Amino acid sequence: MEHYISLFVRAVFIENMALAFFLGMCTFLAVSKNVKTAFGLGIAVTVVLGLSVPLNNLVYNYVLRANALMEGVDLSFLNFITFIGVIAALVQILEMILDRYFPSLYNALGIFLPLITVNCAIFGGVSFMAQRDYNFSESIVYGFGSGIGWMLAIVLLASIREKMKYADVPSGMKGLGVTFVTTGLMALGFMSFSGVQL
């Protein structure tokens, strides 16, 4: 149990997808203007990461890995395209669910919802799972931990950006300039967790 708690904490804080690896930055910067929308996208990314990492783990271990299907067959050259296919299918299902049951969130996310398919944070989580050779239960913990870490980062940035609307920001730094500086400072703050030994 300690191993899974350690893996979860590491995925959320120490190896944060947005602030340690800088993955998923296009949606991270574009959707972080409003906390409510950022939280909705964070939930969507968490769901997709939490489902795609374990599903791709099964596909990788039982279909693509060398000798998985039969002796002498190695389909690992299909890793990337297969991982992207599974992610795309999950995003399409999520998009249909949000359109049907949460239309206001669906409209608020706009074009960024289908872009989760090519969000490099999702693909990065799946790639790290394969590279680090996580088993199925570890991939569940890692997927949800990575999603929660990304959601935490985007909600924190959105709340800071909402407060900065009322701040006296120098004219040359307004908009994305101060957002990049803020993201860098947040990354430095999260880097302090790297000294924690789990």
UniProtKB/Swiss-Prot annotation:
EC number of the protein: 7.2.1.1
Q: One Gene Ontology cellular component annotation?
A: Gram-negative-bacterium-type cell wall
Instruction: Report whether Isomerase shows up as a keyword of the record.
Output: no
- Cross-referenced InterPro entries, in alphabetical order? NqrDE/RnfAE, NqrDE/RnfAE_oxidrdctase, NqrE
Note whether Methyltransferase occurs among the keywords.
no
Q: Which domain of life is it from?
A: Bacteria
GO function terms (MF aspect): oxidoreductase activity, acting on NAD(P)H, quinone or similar compound as acceptor
Provide this UniProt record's keywords sorted from A to Z: Cell inner membrane, Cell membrane, Ion transport, Membrane, NAD, Sodium, Sodium transport, Translocase, Transmembrane, Transmembrane helix, Transport, Ubiquinone
Question: What's one GO BP annotation on this UniProt entry?
Answer: respiratory electron transport chain
Q: Where are the transmembrane segments?
A: 11-31, 39-59, 77-97, 109-129, 140-160, 176-196
Per the record, membrane topology reads:
Multi-pass membrane protein
What top-level class of enzyme does the UniProt entry assign? translocase
Cellular compartment(s): Cell inner membrane
Q: What does the function comment of this entry state? A: NQR complex catalyzes the reduction of ubiquinone-1 to ubiquinol by two successive reactions, coupled with the transport of Na(+) ions from the cytoplasm to the periplasm. NqrA to NqrE are probably involved in the second step, the conversion of ubisemiquinone to ubiquinol.
- Tell me the subunit arrangement: Composed of six subunits; NqrA, NqrB, NqrC, NqrD, NqrE and NqrF.
Q: Which family does it belong to?
A: Belongs to the NqrDE/RnfAE family.
Q: Which HAMAP family match?
A: NqrE (MF_00429)
Which protein are we looking at?
Answer: Na(+)-translocating NADH-quinone reductase subunit E
Species of origin reads Proteus mirabilis (strain HI4320)
